[in-house]
Amino acid sequence: MSHDPLLLPPDLPRPIDDGAGDHLPGRRLPGVEVLATDGTMVDLSAISSPWAVLYVYPRTGVPGVDPPSDWDEIPGARGCTPQSCSFRDVHGELAALGATVFGLSTQVHEEQVEFSRRQHLPFLLLSDPDQIFGEALDLPVFEADDIVAYKRMTIIARAGTIAHVRYPVFPPDRDADEVLAWLYNAARADASASRPVGDSDR
């Protein structure tokens, strides 16, 4: 398979739903700090925006470094660049709905900073190489060569509580559009719930 990170081969293996995200809805985001690409420490449980969108991804490509062996054959491994770019491309629409976007991986800070600058990401990536955040939520991982990576998952939290989980995420380049659609539906449901009884008949 080609290793152009912006392209998804048509024969990528589809990840299965092994139930590794079933325990998350209703859980609080853990109050742990992780290093962000702007050099700050971020505590996702303290985010003040109405919604927090956290896409958890295995790892993005590093210039001049080959991906782990058989990376494309691991279900759900390939596609982190298209996924990240999909969130970049609808970032304004997500922000308009009150969502703050973050990406999280086990990659080191320097690799995330390089990737963020190269792809012009308008949101922060969070580095969790010791899996402190991941262990607090019991996020699923897999191993490739000597790398421990998170399985791809997207978490939508409202006021610090996980409201929705997308797992497995496939295809990854459609993730942001699916999140956007879910948030639009949530906004419509909120508007309907706040409408006075009989208001639709006026």
Where are each of the predicted segments found?
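Chalcogenol-based redox active-site neighborhoods
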Residues: 1-202
